Structure formats: structure tokens, C-alpha cells
Amino acid sequence: IAFCLCLIGDAVINLFMVFSAVCYFVAHCVFVRCYFYFRKPKFWQFVVWIVVFACICIFIQFVKVSSLLKIFGVLYTFAMTAMVMFSFGIPKQLMIGSIIFFVSDILMLRNFIYSETVVSHFFSLGSYYVAVMLIAVKIFFGFGEEVCESK
């Protein structure tokens, strides 16, 4: 489901940015839910998530964009940071994919807020596709013995 939402978001990003962003937001939430299936989150993950989320929200307040974009940025950051924080402790390939996905999202938001260059666009899309491939390969080809740590 999350990959389909990412695909839909990719397909319509130039036509309907808000709809595309909603697709990505829901995809991040679906990934987080899947990560909970593989490993119950630890208390420290919640603490780190809240701290990172708060720091990014503070930074968002200093960006010169409309209030609506700031609200959207906070909501999107909520899902992005959750995906990264709750990826710790699950198979490393998923964790690395989640971190790269986060970086690609930050680059995409930067490109959206400021004028994008060919280089920044290349790094944004390049890191996005690497992240999606890392996650997809691990999900589609199985987990072996790594699944469901309950510690």
C-alpha cells in the first residue's frame, strides 16, 4: 500500500502538490505501522522521535513560507521522523532505506521552498529512488530470520 501511495504521489507531484504530499504522508504512516509489526517500539525511540520532531518544528518556524505550508511541514515532519526513529531495531536494510528516504524528503522540501537546481533535484530524486529500492527489495524478497524481534 505504501509503495502504491508513493507511486501515485510521484505521478501527480507536478500537477497536484498537496495531493501528492498527502499520498507521501499516508505512505510514511503505513511504513511506520509495518515497522511496528516487525518490532515493538522502545521507549527511547519515542523520546528521540519527539526531540527530533520538536527540533525540526522549531526550524520550520524560521522558514519564510506561508502559515499553511508551515502547518503542512509540521504534519509531514511528524510522519517522516516517525519512519526513521521506529526503523531502528528492524532489519538494517529497512533502517538504512528509511534514513535515506528521510534525507530525500528533506531535500525535496528544500527544493520546494527554494528554487531547485539540477544538482539538488538529482540528489533529491536519486536518494529517494535508492531508499525506495532498499525498502522494496527487503520487503519483496523476504526477511529470513530477522523478522519480529520482541525484545
Question: Which stretches of residues belong to each language-model region?
Answer:
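Polytopic alpha-helical membrane-helix bundles and their juxtamembrane interface segments
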Residues: 1-151
